[in-house]
């Protein structure tokens, strides 16, 4: 089990990403459009983007297992780590999933 503080930190990061998502996208759009905006406007937008909190970047968020909080080997489709996914599948608690046999 991951520490509660680590799980809470990830939740806080997710909230921060959602809070600044529109502003980040707006600034990135200004930076991308070379023909529309002047160099000064683009430089100002880049500076504003750099001043946003680091945790506002989506790449800082790490997927964690919903049950254990484990950060590695988490399946996106289920939101579970490989260990918990196997346990729940073997007990038949994950609908539509069963052990392969051929």
Swiss-Prot record:
Q: Which Gene3D superfamilies match?
A: 1.10.287.1480
**An individual GO BP term:** translation
**One MF term in the entry's GO annotations:** structural constituent of ribosome
What domain of life is recorded for the organism?
A: Bacteria
Coiled coil start-end: none
InterPro entries membership: Ribosomal_uS14, Ribosomal_uS14_bac/plastid, Ribosomal_uS14_CS
Keywords associated with the record: Ribonucleoprotein, Ribosomal protein, RNA-binding, rRNA-binding
Q: Which PROSITE patterns match?
A: RIBOSOMAL_S14
Q: Which HAMAP family match?
A: Ribosomal_uS14_1 (MF_00537)
Q: Which family does it belong to?
A: Belongs to the universal ribosomal protein uS14 family.
- Please give the subunit comment from the record: Part of the 30S ribosomal subunit. Contacts proteins S3 and S10.
Main function: Binds 16S rRNA, required for the assembly of 30S particles and may also be responsible for determining the conformation of the 16S rRNA at the A site.
NCBIfam families per the UniProt record, alphabetical: PRK08881.1
Name of the protein: Small ribosomal subunit protein uS14
Q: Which gene encodes it?
A: rpsN
């Amino acid at each position: 089990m991951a520490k509660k503080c680590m799980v809470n930190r990830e939740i806080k990061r997710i909230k921060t990403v959602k809070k600044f998502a529109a502003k980040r996208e707006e600034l990135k759009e200004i930076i991308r459009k070379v023909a529309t905006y002047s160099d000064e406007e683009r430089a100002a937008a880049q500076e504003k983007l750099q001043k946003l909190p680091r945790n506002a970047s989506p790449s800082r968020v790490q997927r964690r297992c919903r049950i254990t909080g484990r950060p590695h080997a988490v399946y996106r489709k289920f939101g579970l780590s490989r260990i918990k996914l196997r346990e729940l599948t073997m007990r038949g608690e994950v609908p539509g999933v069963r052990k392969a046999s051929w």
